[in-house]
A protein has these predicted regions:
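Conserved HGGG/HGGXW glycine-rich cap/lid loop of the alpha/beta-hydrolase fold
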Residues: 14-58
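Active-site loop/oxyanion-hole signature of alpha/beta-hydrolase fold enzymes
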Residues: 37, 47-88
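Alpha-helical elements of Rossmann-like donor-binding domains used by nucleotide-donor carbohydrate transfer enzymes
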Residues: 11, 34-37, 41, 68-75, ...
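Aromatic/acidic, Gly/Pro-rich catalytic loop(s) in extracytoplasmic/lumenal soluble domains
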Residues: 1
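Conserved hydrolase catalytic core segment
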Residues: 83-110
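Active-site acidic short loop of glycosyltransferases
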Residues: 17-19, 44, 78-84, 105-106
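A short loop-to-beta-strand scaffold at the N-terminal edge of the catalytic core in hydrolase folds
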Residues: 4-15
Length: 110
């Protein structure tokens, strides 16, 4: 299990295994810890992280959009050198996932 912060300040946990990575997005007022029970339950690599302004990831601007959240994911998966991902979202995380799919559909497996 890797606990780290990427070059843009996003805190994440990574359980490196095989297959296409599964990325979990938490909801408002929560952080990556909501997904702790899932991180070891998959044969695939699992990535959990703190969305902007939550947990250990700072918010460095006054206004934020769904595009900012989607850009956060693309920056993180690019840095980790993930080509395609599976994306799972809860609450606002599902809206972020929908936005990500609109902007970066070529990076989604499911």
């Amino acid at each position: 299990m890797i606990n780290a912060t990427d070059s843009k300040g996003t805190f994440y946990k990574l359980n490196q295994k095989e297959g296409i990575p599964i990325v979990f997005i938490h909801g408002v007022g929560l952080d990556h810890n909501i997904w702790d029970p899932q991180i070891n339950e998959f044969d695939n690599t699992v990535l959990i992280y703190d969305i902007l302004g939550h947990g250990r990831t700072p918010l460095n601007k006054e206004k934020i959009s769904f595009d900012d959240f989607s850009d956060q994911i693309i920056d993180l998966i690019d840095e980790l050198k993930f080509d395609k991902i599976h994306l799972v979202g809860f609450s606002i995380g599902s809206l972020i996932a929908r936005n990500f799919g609109t902007k970066f559909s070529d990076r989604l497996k499911a």
